[in-house]
Amino acid sequence: LKYIKMNQSNEDFEIPVPWFLIKHPEGDVVIDGGNAIEVAIDKHAHWGAVVNAYDPVMKKSDNCVEQAKSVGTNISDVRYLIQSHLHLDHSGGVGRFPNAIHVVQRLEYDYAFNPDWFAAPAYIRKDFDKPNIHWKYLNDKKTDFFDLYGDGVITIIFSPGHSPGHQS
């Protein structure tokens, strides 16, 4: 995805929606996944009224799976999908990588199913409430500085603020 247009002022402005693919000797890792491909197909059907504030600008080919394939990644080889949090512009990769273990803070996962009124529009439940997802839950400070492969290359840090269970 290139960006999201927002109309909170008199002029639109763009917000980048990045996601990351890390090639690691122990297995590929995706961090976040950008927007779900469904917003490129029918953004109103997928996000509903949220598009009045956040207008996803995306072609179908911009989704994380197609982009990963475009650089030679076999999506079956993605070993982990790390979710910084489960907001709509980060959860597009959930369930798209068939063998991936999805790493998320337990606090974030639980909150995403029952957010407060202000945060609720940021969570699109159908993006992460899917069958057959292998979740690995981290437990905030108890698992802080979680070393994914035990080699110091990818370390997950509990960083609440933007969302209750945000991790970096």
Go through each PLM region and give its residues.
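Conserved beta-strand hairpin/beta-sheet module of binuclear metal-dependent hydrolase folds
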Residues: 2-66, 168
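Short Gly/Pro-enriched turn/cap motifs at secondary-structure boundaries
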Residues: 9-13, 157-162
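Residues that flank catalytic or metal-binding motifs in active/ligand-binding sites
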Residues: 14-18, 98, 131, 144, ...
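Active-site neighborhood of phospho(di)ester-bond hydrolases with catalytic His/Asp-centered motifs
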Residues: 30-33, 79-85, 104-105, 157-161
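Short, glycine/acidic-enriched loop or turn micro-motifs at the edges of active sites
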Residues: 35, 88, 165
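Short, solvent-exposed loop/turn and secondary-structure capping segments
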Residues: 41-42, 94-96, 114-115
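Active-site metal-binding motif and surrounding structural segment of the metallo-beta-lactamase
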Residues: 46-104
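Metallo-beta-lactamase
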Residues: 55-77, 105-158
